[in-house]
């Protein structure tokens, strides 16, 4: 990996071998920055800041990350260039037009102290966790979520207008419902598969019969996640509230997840060790 003007790195090359890598160094020398660069190549975002310009070295106008991988018997090249105008992504020297086509090329999983906030923070943090992981696994999910967010922004803007276009509101609601069915089903499946993998590992670590689980809270019951008409009825039922508030109050942008240990909410009953 090569880092140019990324955080405190002016122009640095780093090589990794197979197996476990242990990164050692004094404080403020760039250990976390190195991991941040790897994670940026996976998700095209930082886990520490929402502003890409914060990643650019002081007094510079851009940064570059070059990553060379060897997998599946062949060499692969990834490049990320970020400047004040935005991101430029490349695979094997070819420009990538859509971020969704780049995310997941490097499938990295990050665990850091801030992850403890997953249980105590707002539902937005839990949705973000699911969205990031699913985006690395499914381009369809990434594209559908992006389209939904665009439609949601348009619907909210429409709700704030004095003269409401009823036909356009209906069209937006229908298009959003189509997206939401895909999003809800993929979120539900992801959580089911995640916990199926986690349960035996958790029991092994805890060395007891503690049962971990989750409840996915969304706008439809788990048995009706593909019921488009039911979702549209909810939009219609919430129409007056949406008009009064000037925003859409029903949808997957309000989803949440409750994590449990032996049926009890992790946030209220789990120890710090259990949360980790």
What are these regions (language model features)?
Residues 42-125, 131-141, 195-199, 227, ...:
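Nucleotide-state sensing region of NTPase/ATPase domains
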Residues 55-58, 148, 187:
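Intracellular alpha-helical coupling/juxtamembrane segments of multi-pass membrane proteins
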Residues 5, 34, 55, 65, ...:
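Conserved RecA-like P-loop NTPase ATPase core
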Residues 1-26, 167-276:
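Conserved NTPase motor "head" modules and their coupling/switch loops across ABC/AAA+ ATPases, GTPases
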Residues 17-54, 271-276:
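Phosphate-binding glycine-rich loops of NTP-binding sites
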Residues 129-132, 154, 175-182:
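A general alpha-helix detector
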Residues 41, 132, 136, 151-154, ...:
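Conserved, well-folded catalytic cores of nucleic-acid-processing
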Residues 142-176, 209-211:
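Extended, charged coiled-coil "arm/hinge" scaffolds of SMC/Rad50-like chromosome-maintenance ATPases
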């Amino acid at each position: 990996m090569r880092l140019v003007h990324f955080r405190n790195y002016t122009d640095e090359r780093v090589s990794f071998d197979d197996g476990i890598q242990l990164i050692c160094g004094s404080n403020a020398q760039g250990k976390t920055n190195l991991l941040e660069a790897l994670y940026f190549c996976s998700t095209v975002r930082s886990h520490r800041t929402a502003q890409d310009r914060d990643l650019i070295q002081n007094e510079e106008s851009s940064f570059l990350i070059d990553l060379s991988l060897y997998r599946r018997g062949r060499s692969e090249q990834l490049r990320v260039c970020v400047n004040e105008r935005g991101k430029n992504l490349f695979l094997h020297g070819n420009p990538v037009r859509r971020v969704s086509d780049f995310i997941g090329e490097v499938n990295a999983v990050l665990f850091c102290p801030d992850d403890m906030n997953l249980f105590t923070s707002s539902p937005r943090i839990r949705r973000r966790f699911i969205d990031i992981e699913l985006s690395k696994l499914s381009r369809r999910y990434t594209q559908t979520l992006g389209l939904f967010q665009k439609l949601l922004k348009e619907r909210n803007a429409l709700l704030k207008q004095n003269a409401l276009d009823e036909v356009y509101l209906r069209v937006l609601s229908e298009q959003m419902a189509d997206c939401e069915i895909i999003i809800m089903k993929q979120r539900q499946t992801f959580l089911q598969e995640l916990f199926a993998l986690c349960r035996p590992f958790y029991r092994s670590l805890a060395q007891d019969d503690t049962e971990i689980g989750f409840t996915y809270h969304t706008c439809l019951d788990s048995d009706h996640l593909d019921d488009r008409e039911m979702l549209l009825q909810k939009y219609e039922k919430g129409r007056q509230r949406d008009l009064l508030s000037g925003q859409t109050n029903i949808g997957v942008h309000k989803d949440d997840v409750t994590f449990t240990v032996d049926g009890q909410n992790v946030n209220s009953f789990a120890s710090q060790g259990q949360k980790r």
